[in-house]
Curated annotation (Swiss-Prot):
It is a multi-pass membrane protein. GO terms for molecular function: transmembrane transporter activity. It is found in: Cell membrane. HAMAP family: EcfT. The chain crosses the membrane at residues 29-49, 73-93, 110-130, 143-163, 242-262. InterPro entries: ABC/ECF_trnsptr_transmembrane (IPR003339), EcfT (IPR024919). It comes from Brevibacillus brevis (strain 47 / JCM 6285 / NBRC 100599). This is Energy-coupling factor transporter transmembrane protein EcfT. Its main location: membrane.
Length: 265
């Protein structure tokens, strides 16, 4: 049920996205996320969707595999859609039954919000799928570097963010194992009232928390055994350098800003 979660995983490769500098990818993700929230009409969202699909092709990864990153949040997206259809009012009334109405603004907001969530998750998945944990950590550290001058532990922050991303598929896999084990013991997570289903989650939550703390402790012990000192005196075999690929990323970023700004109403 939870296997093959794409977000948080890294798939080695030699594609354009794999070989681009992690700093340029991180900066582009921030810019793209901003553009997602600035988009407010069909044309701007169509442009962003088209670009996301093209980026997926550039990664040379299976599109179906990338789309699996939406699996863990499809319930959240569905809930958001229903919530906006019920609450947001305005415009043409499409359907009415007593006090309940489905109106133009509600449908519009439901579609746009679900697209925002989906695009954010997909573009974030492309980042982790095409960037190794080491490169991602170093890229974050280099971008946050100026904060180190005022005493902020930049390396530790970058490492924590990288580990948090990489723990997502691990915890999802652990959740899947626990669900299968509880199902084998007779637990039922697919039927019954909402309250009963919530109670059935307790046998999953407790072992999952225990497993998460155990894995965190094992990771801490492994880092300590290898002499981890927070990046003090650390050297690097391969230093990050900007290439022509990053120039293309910069040009594409400028073009996207201009196009979205032009079509935004």
């Amino acid at each position: 049920m939870l296997q093959n979660i794409a977000i948080g995983q890294y798939v080695p490769g030699q594609s354009f996205l794999h070989r681009a500098d992690p700093r340029s990818k991180l900066l582009f993700i921030i810019l793209f996320a901003t553009l997602i929230f600035l988009a407010n009409n069909t044309v701007t969202y169509a442009i962003l969707i088209g670009f996301t699909l093209y980026a997926a092709l550039l990664s040379r990864l299976s599109l179906s595999y990338i789309l699996k990153s939406l699996k863990p949040v499809w319930i959240l997206i569905l809930f958001t859609v229903v919530l906006h259809i019920f609450i947001t009012k305005g415009g043409t009334v499409y359907f009415q039954w007593g006090w309940f109405t489905v109106e133009e603004q509600g449908v519009r907001q439901a579609i746009f919000i679900s697209l925002r969530l989906g695009l954010l998750i997909l573009i974030s998945s492309l980042l982790t799928l095409t960037t190794s944990p080491i490169d991602l950590t170093e890229g974050l550290e280099r971008l946050l570097g100026p904060l180190g001058k005022i005493g902020i532990p930049v390396h530790d922050i970058a490492l924590m963010m990288s580990i948090a991303l990489r723990f997502i598929p691990t915890l999802m896999e652990e959740t899947d194992k626990i669900i299968k084990a509880q199902t084998a013991r007779g637990a039922n997570f697919t039927s019954g009232s909402l309250v009963r289903r919530a109670k059935n989650l307790i046998p999953i939550a407790i072992p999952l928390f225990v497993s998460a703390f155990r894995r965190a402790e094992e990771l801490a012990l492994a880092m300590e055994a290898r002499g981890y000192r927070g990046g003090v005196g650390r050297t690097r075999l391969n230093k990050l350098t900007f290439t022509w690929r990053d120039g293309i990323v910069a040009v594409v970023s400028v073009i996207l800003v201009i196009v979205i700004g032009w079509w935004r109403t």
